[in-house]
Amino acid sequence: MAVEMFYDDDADLSIIQGRKVAVIGYGSQGHAHSLSLRDSGVEVRVGLAEGSKSRPKAEEAGLTVGTPAEVSAWADVIMLLAPDTAQASIFTNDIEPNLKDGDALFFGHGLNIHFGLIKPPANVTIGMVAPKGPGHLVRRQFVDGKGVPALIAIDQDPKGEGQALALSYAKGIGGTRAGVIKTTFKEETETDLFGEQAVLCGGTEELVKTGFEVMVEAGYAPEMAYFEVLHELKLIVDLMYEGGIARMNYSVSDTAEFGGYLSGPRVIDAGTKERMKEILKDIQDGTFVKRLVANVEGGNKELEGLRKQNAEHPIEVTGAKLRGLMSWVDRPITETA
């Protein structure tokens, strides 16, 4: 099914320029949205809790900062870019009491709306503007006069202005320069979660760890295993990112290409596909989100346990040591080895 695309000529920037926008959060996406909207002539305020470490950064950038409640009361368009697990409480405590007839509440991801964790009043426009790239790229492309493709969706539209407003907002952060795709909260949420769990985060992580274990258990040095299954992964992903799977296969050796064709289906087989379908079903029917909410309500104990277990895997010890030899790699603050 063909998607509906929009570009600069399809969006009226004056719509968002005539509104007052509150951006809740100043992380990766929050800083890109706030600064780019401001540079597009939009009146913007940033909502951050008292004592937030991001407050000085936003203020140094010349942005007006208030608490989430303060900026929500001031604004008529609110973009909620706090972490998924914090959004429901921010909505209940800070946003909902300050919503007025005709306001718009936008999101960068649809989870809380799609799964009913946030239930907004009927007189508020509910929409999504979601750039398909990290915030630093969104901002850099905007400054360079370009843009990152974005998604828009409208879930609730009491005044019939939602799509025009979302397109205007997307233009304000550079999205329509590249192209904006119209989707739904359901489609964006379920595809995003599936991609993260089955392929990008969960699937890739387990593939790498298992490959490392197989090599080390067969007697190969952990350092050699690390280079082959993790370090070189970036080279392959970069090729796929730039030109698809065909570009990757064109760029690697014939030996690597031929071996990949033969062995790839032995690793990812019909059974894997069936299990991926089960993961998708758990996402669609809300099983995953129920567990996510239970984890948060339980003080993140399950998540912390999984993090600890993951951090203790031998590949992490080996990787920390080897990355210390790589002057071109920015080592994260979690590594002290």
Swiss-Prot record:
Its EC number is 1.1.1.86. One of its GO terms (biological process) is isoleucine biosynthetic process. Binds 2 magnesium ions per subunit. GO terms for molecular function: ketol-acid reductoisomerase activity; magnesium ion binding; NADP binding. The active site is at H109. NADP(+) binds at Y26, G27, S28, Q29, S52, S54, D84, T85, A86, Q87, G135. Mg(2+) 1 binds at D192, E196. Residues 184-329 form the KARI C-terminal knotted domain. PROSITE patterns: KARI_C, KARI_N. It holds the Pfam family KARI_N. One of its GO terms (cellular component) is cytosol. It is an enzyme of class 1 (oxidoreductase). Residues 3-183 form the KARI N-terminal Rossmann domain. Substrate binds at S253. Mg(2+) 2 binds at D192, E228, E232. Belongs to the ketol-acid reductoisomerase family. PANTHER family: KETOL-ACID REDUCTOISOMERASE, MITOCHONDRIAL. Involved in the biosynthesis of branched-chain amino acids (BCAA). Catalyzes an alkyl-migration followed by a ketol-acid reduction of (S)-2-acetolactate (S2AL) to yield (R)-2,3-dihydroxy-isovalerate. In the isomerase reaction, S2AL is rearranged via a Mg-dependent methyl migration to produce 3-hydroxy-3-methyl-2-ketobutyrate (HMKB). In the reductase reaction, this 2-ketoacid undergoes a metal-dependent reduction by NADPH to yield (R)-2,3-dihydroxy-isovalerate. This is Ketol-acid reductoisomerase (NADP(+)). It comes from Nocardia farcinica (strain IFM 10152). The gene is ilvC.
